[in-house]
Amino acid sequence: MINKVVANAEEALKGIEDGMTIMMGGFGLCGIPENSISALIKKGTKNLTCISNNAGVDDFGLGLLLQTKQIKKMISSYVGENAEFERQMLSGELEVDLIPQGTLATRCMMAGYGIPFFPTPAGVGTEVANGKQMINWKGRDYLIEEAFEADFAIVKAWKGDTAGNLIFRSTARNFNQPMSMGGKITIAEVEELLPAGSLQPDQIHTPGIYVHRIFQGHNYEKRIEQRTVRKK
């Protein structure tokens, strides 16, 4: 069984160059590959296209890469919690492609399945449909959406083994799982790295065949996106 372990985030990110397209896992502020984002900032790679459900917040997640102006284009679904994202988008500094959330996840999965495109009714009759091919099937219109082509996918898992098998935890599974299948090279950072064979096969969410590099992450934060307390 192939050992896919690398020493750290810096080693895992080798080969990422200016102008590449990267899938970045996470949902809200959970399941974010924090170590890899920090390493990308130090690496200084720029003009990136990032595919992610959201853009983090101003001082966490992809918001950190927006602060350093390393992202050229965001392909996302929900971006409403990041003031710096809004500023860059409205000023024309940042290209933005907003995609329905289900379509975003499916375009990631289709890349992993090797399926080049798929039909969906989501977005028909809206700006999402502009410039896209449409078909009519049994009296209903569908958009033709293409699978993503990402140079790298970077995800964070709860547990992983040295062969690259991954288990995600609760909501953090949301986009990490489909993205872990969709990159030409997939990098996984994990909270707990175990020997191959330690994970129960029926609990594995992403088989190691999709994962190329894995490393033990450290110092993860447990951020709260919006703190709400009861009023007395």
Q: PLM features: residue spans?
A:
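Conserved alpha/beta enzyme-core scaffold
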Residues: 1-232
